[in-house]
A protein has these predicted regions:
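Short Cys/His-rich micro-motifs in 6-15 aa windows
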Residues: 17-25
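Short Cys/His-rich zinc-binding micro-motifs
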Residues: 1-9
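Short solvent-exposed beta->alpha transition segments
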Residues: 49-78
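Short beta-strand edge/turn micro-motifs at domain boundaries
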Residues: 103-105
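Surface-exposed, charged secondary-structure patches
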Residues: 67-98
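Short, aromatic-enriched amphipathic alpha-helices that serve as compact interaction elements
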Residues: 26-40
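Cysteine-centered loop/knuckle micro-motif
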Residues: 13-15
Length: 105
């Protein structure tokens, strides 16, 4: 299976090792790709575990899992990687009302 993060790699060779805790994402880009894949699969455990502790109070693991399930995750575009600890990205998805959405950070 191709990895949902749009890396053109197989899931088993890309984001799956992060999702199974075999490896930890070494860069902000790898972390972002793994989180996008976790929404697409979905994997609420991984999403909660990789959410900043200060932000965990805003969502439950179940809510993250559901958000992954109710949306169709189309594409992740890496816009800029200024440093290993920063990434600018665009996540494209279709929401539960069939509206195209773009999340840009």
């Amino acid at each position: 299976m191709n990895c949902p993060c749009c890396s053109n790699k197989l899931y088993a060779e890309c984001c799956e090792p992060y999702h199974t805790k075999e490896k930890y994402a070494p860069t902000a880009e790898a972390l972002m790709r793994s989180r996008f894949s976790a929404f697409a699969i979905p994997n609420g455990d991984y999403l909660m575990n990789t959410t900043l502790p200060a932000k965990r109070k805003f969502h439950t693991k179940e809510e993250l899992q559901e958000w992954g399930e109710i949306n169709q995750w189309i594409k992740l575009e890496i816009v800029n990687v200024p440093t290993m600890n920063q990434v600018e990205f665009k996540a494209y998805y279709i929401d539960q009302d069939q509206n195209e959405q773009l999340h840009h950070e």
